[in-house]
């Protein structure tokens, strides 16, 4: 049995959020028998794999470091944690905490001087206490909040624009409906408001003048029409002599022949 169980424990970093235990068992099981596999969920992105033999763990580190694991190019190396009293394995590497990386509880605070942070590469603290990581999280949260506020403003503007357009369309429709109704009824569109009397009934229009009234007016005023008629009359009528008849002319002609 090895003096430090961390010699058999392998840290797997730079994993995606969708890494599964079965996938890690399949990949690392090709190098030897496994004791346990633990995947971090809060925060995600790393895992610990413990082998039965330290030699198998070293072979897995040499063969898988920088290779694609669970769809991501992973970083594989031996865990740097010391032997823990709980027997859960070494802490170290990638924010496993002082207690254990294979499902053990986090017991420490900021870590020891020989602990390595896999976020910034520095020593003396764990990844979950890394300042650079917290700064990145704050930037992500700020950008997400700004994007949400921008999308909300766009939605409110679009809703107000559609409401105003619908209101204007409704008012135009009501106006056109009123005008059409008046045209169909006929009475409302023909007569204006000042042509209605106090009771609301429409005053009937005056009847048109008759033709003979126009002629009488022309005669009285001496219009050109009456003058032309008087000029066209025969001279006998103007002198006051009675008009000749056809019978009289024929009788005079017969007497002259005799």
UniProtKB/Swiss-Prot annotation:
Main localisation: nucleus
Q: Which UniProt keywords apply?
A: Metal-binding, mRNA processing, mRNA splicing, Nucleus, RNA-binding, Zinc, Zinc-finger
Ranges for domain RRM come to: 8-81
Description of the deletion phenotype: Conditional RNAi-mediated knockdown in female fat body results in altered expression and differential exon usage of genes involved in metabolism of lipids and carbohydrates, the immune response and the response to xenobiotics.
Which InterPro entries has this protein been placed in?
Answer: Nucleotide-bd_a/b_plait_sf (IPR012677), RBD_domain_sf (IPR035979), RRM_dom (IPR000504), Znf_CCHC (IPR001878), Znf_CCHC_sf (IPR036875)
Gly residues: bias regions: 86-103
Q: Name one GO molecular function term.
A: RNA binding
What Gene3D superfamilies does the entry give?
3.30.70.330, Zinc finger, CCHC-type (4.10.60.10)
Summary of subunit composition and partner proteins: Interacts (via Arg/Ser-rich region) with Alsin2/CG7564, Rbp1 and Doa (via N-terminus).
Question: Which named protein is this?
Answer: Serine/arginine-rich splicing factor x16
Organism in which the protein naturally occurs? Drosophila melanogaster
Q: Identify the taxonomic lineage of the organism of origin.
A: Eukaryota, Metazoa, Ecdysozoa, Arthropoda, Hexapoda
Q: Which gene encodes it?
A: x16
